[in-house]
């Protein structure tokens, strides 16, 4: 994060790209693989595209592992833990779930025995999708102490991050949304 901040201080010729829990949307997670497939038809290798895709595909797994490790440090298992996922959309301040890493993260957490709720101001409910059948309703941002961990997956501008950190037992931040907030409760991944 600090390297990106330094690089974007350049007055021209820099486009910041921020790491997170995985890629989403209608083009970035899919289109490079089309290019790779097409290149193979002409006997070209696109190893860098494939490596980037591999890293991006594994980020939800990395994020879930960060949650499990953060809970373990608090002497709490992921199995049976109450988790609140903040943000469903694939990027901040939009209502688009296409290829969202949040859905994969929720599914992975549930498969490991976590009791998962979500909050997203753009999605009062989420149900059957192309790949996921979550059938969930947006949980209010009240009584955050009931959750063993709050996971920031989408950094919507509507969220009051200082308040979320203050009221939570543990926060895993996958988007650097808590930048500038100093608390032992925060785990940044």
Predicted regions and their residues:
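Structural/interface elements that position substrates and couple domains in central-metabolism enzymes
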Residues: 1-189
């Amino acid at each position: 994060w600090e390297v990106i901040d330094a690089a974007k201080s350049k007055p021209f010729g820099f486009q910041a790209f921020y790491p997170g829990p995985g890629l989403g949307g209608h083009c970035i997670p899919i289109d490079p693989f089309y290019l790779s497939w097409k290149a193979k038809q002409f006997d070209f290798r696109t190893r860098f595209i494939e490596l980037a895709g591999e890293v991006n595909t594994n980020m939800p797994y990395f994020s879930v592992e960060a949650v499990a490790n953060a809970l373990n440090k608090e002497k709490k298992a992921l199995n049976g833990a109450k988790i609140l996922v903040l943000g469903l959309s694939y990027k901040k301040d939009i209502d688009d779930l296409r290829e969202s890493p949040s859905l994969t993260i929720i599914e992975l957490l549930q498969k490991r025995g976590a009791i998962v709720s979500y909050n997203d101001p753009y999605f009062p409910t989420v149900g059957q999708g192309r790949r996921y059948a979550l059938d969930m309703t947006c949980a209010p941002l009240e009584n955050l102490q009931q959750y063993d961990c709050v996971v920031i997956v989408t950094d919507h501008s509507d969220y009051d991050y200082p308040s979320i950190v203050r009221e939570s037992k543990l926060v895993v931040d996958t988007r650097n949304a808590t930048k500038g907030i100093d608390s032992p409760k925060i785990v940044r991944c």
